[in-house]
């Protein structure tokens, strides 16, 4: 056991539903065996009275959204939380509130992905064009859609990327279908992907890929089909069985995602936002074989990730060690780590595949300024079954040093306070 962990204190705030779903008490017990004290925070009391805290783990998404709706109680809770963070910059926060705000807004997170992909210049990645609709569709809507590279069919999602309503989506096949769209929302080109979704669950330097069912293929271009309204959570459940996921036939390219691409995307998001606990939804374009990021989620459910608690504890140990040694520990490149796969049917897509290194990937970002600066920074500068794929460790841990996380809080604070 690492002796530097003895006496460390980890505070957490999660909804009761999240605590039960994750069985978070088991994580608390795992921490105690390593000499770490785990404290369940009560935000109705001053956090100062519950400290000192070396690490805070939270999912304040509901509270943040309610605060943005000017709910007085939620505003007070967020203020109290941020006040403690500001007073204790040495406390590691998983994850910074400004980063969570970005991930709660699909329009902002899609724009961030677009900038990351433009910088990576990796031909294996090409996420779909998107556009935010802020008002009811009018005469100029089709022109704006075309200007932004959108074509039928496209998928319509709520702008807010959290909560029950965030899973309510629609596939629109023609101009008549636009009448049913309720703004504010984000529209995104629908990419045929042979009804397979890959959910990437990231925990610090580690990630696990879980295969889920997804929407079947649809013909490109305008058609006379009526819009399809669906709940993405229900469609992509491991045991989901729906006419929307029943693939008529496999078309074009059908392969699993590249570990290298996932590693680089995960690393780039960590560097851009300073986040450690997030999920990435990836599909493979069945015409080009390219990876498309269709959503990014803050602190997902980690269903199917058997090593979640171990990964989380290891990540906490890494960032605490980096803090105690002045960041030296985080400069080492962690080796890839594979977990044993879950039982899978023969011919499953979960077989390992090694990809050649691409010099154009953002593995060369270390020491460079990233171009996907936030608005504030720019201003200051001027199928059917669930299958688990290999569990990896990201090849770089520099993106989550405590100093970097505090930089993210500072650089995004102005933007967050204005939302």
Swiss-Prot record:
The gene is Itpk1. Monomer. Interacts with GPS1/COPS1. The modification N6-acetyllysine is found at residues 388, 415. PANTHER family: INOSITOL-TETRAKISPHOSPHATE 1-KINASE. It catalyses: 1D-myo-inositol 3,4,5,6-tetrakisphosphate + ATP = 1D-myo-inositol 1,3,4,5,6-pentakisphosphate + ADP + H(+); 1D-myo-inositol 1,3,4-trisphosphate + ATP = 1D-myo-inositol 1,3,4,5-tetrakisphosphate + ADP + H(+); 1D-myo-inositol 1,3,4-trisphosphate + ATP = 1D-myo-inositol 1,3,4,6-tetrakisphosphate + ADP + H(+); 1D-myo-inositol 3,4,6-trisphosphate + ATP = 1D-myo-inositol 1,3,4,6-tetrakisphosphate + ADP + H(+). It holds the Pfam family Ins134_P3_kin_N. Its cofactor is Mg(2+). Belongs to the ITPK1 family. The modification Phosphoserine is found at residue 401. Mg(2+) 1 binds at residues 281, 295. This is Inositol-tetrakisphosphate 1-kinase. GO terms for cellular component: apical plasma membrane. The lineage of its organism: Eukaryota, Metazoa, Chordata, Craniata, Vertebrata. Keywords: Acetylation, ATP-binding, Hydrolase, Isomerase, Kinase, Magnesium, Metal-binding, Nucleotide-binding, Phosphoprotein, Transferase. PROSITE patterns: ATP_GRASP (PS50975). Binds 2 magnesium ions per subunit. 1D-myo-inositol 1,3,4-trisphosphate binds at residues 18, 167, 199, 297. ATP binds at residues 106, 157, 188-199, 214, 232, 236. Its EC number is 2.7.1.134, 2.7.1.159. Transmembrane segments: none annotated. Mg(2+) 2 binds at residues 295, 297. One of its GO terms (biological process) is inositol trisphosphate metabolic process. Residues 117-334 form the ATP-grasp domain.
């Amino acid at each position: 056991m690492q002796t530097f962990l003895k006496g460390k204190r980890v505070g957490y705030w999660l909804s009761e539903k999240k605590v039960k779903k994750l069985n978070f008490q088991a994580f608390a017990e795992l921490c105690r065996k390593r000499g770490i004290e785990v404290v369940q925070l009560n935000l109705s009391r001053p956090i100062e009275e519950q400290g000192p805290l070396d690490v805070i783990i939270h999912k304040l998404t509901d509270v943040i959204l309610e605060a943005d709706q000017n709910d007085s109680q939620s505003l007070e809770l967020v203020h109290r939380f941020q006040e403690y963070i500001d007073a204790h910059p040495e406390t590691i926060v998983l994850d910074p509130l400004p980063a969570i705000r970005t991930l709660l807004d699909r329009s902002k997170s899609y724009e961030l992905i677009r900038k990351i992909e433009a910088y990576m210049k990796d031909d294996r990645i090409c996420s779909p064009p998107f556009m935010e609709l802020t008002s009811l569709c009018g005469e100029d809507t089709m022109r704006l859609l075309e200007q932004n590279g959108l074509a039928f069919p496209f998928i319509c999602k709520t702008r807010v990327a959290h909560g029950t309503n965030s899973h309510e989506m629609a596939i629109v096949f023609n101009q008549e279908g636009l009448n049913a769209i309720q703004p504010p929302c984000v529209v995104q080109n629908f990419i045929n992907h042979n009804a397979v979704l890959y959910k990437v669950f990231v925990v610090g330097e580690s990630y696990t890929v879980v295969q889920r069912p997804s929407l079947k293929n649809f013909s490109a271009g305008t058609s006379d089909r009526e819009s399809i309204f669906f709940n993405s959570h229900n469609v992509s459940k491991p045991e989901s069985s729906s006419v929307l996921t029943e693939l008529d036939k496999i078309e074009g390219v059908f392969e699993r995602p590249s570990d290298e691409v996932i590693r680089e995307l995960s690393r780039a998001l960590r560097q851009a936002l300073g986040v450690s606990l997030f999920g990435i939804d990836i599909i493979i374009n069945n015409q080009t074989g390219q990876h498309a990021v269709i959503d990014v989620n803050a602190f997902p459910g980690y269903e199917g990730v058997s090593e979640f608690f171990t990964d989380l504890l290891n990540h906490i140990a890494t960032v605490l060690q980096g803090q105690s040694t002045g960041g030296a520990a985080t400069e080492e490149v962690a080796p890839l780590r594979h977990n044993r796969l879950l039982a899978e049917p023969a011919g499953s897509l979960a077989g390992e595949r090694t990809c050649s290194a691409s010099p154009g990937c953002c593995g060369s970002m270390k020491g460079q300024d990233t171009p996907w600066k936030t608005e504030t920074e720019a201003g200051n500068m001027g199928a059917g079954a669930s299958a688990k794929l290999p569990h990896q460790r990201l090849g770089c841990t520099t993106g989550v040093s405590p100093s970097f996380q505090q930089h993210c809080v500072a650089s995004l604070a102005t933007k967050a306070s204005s939302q």
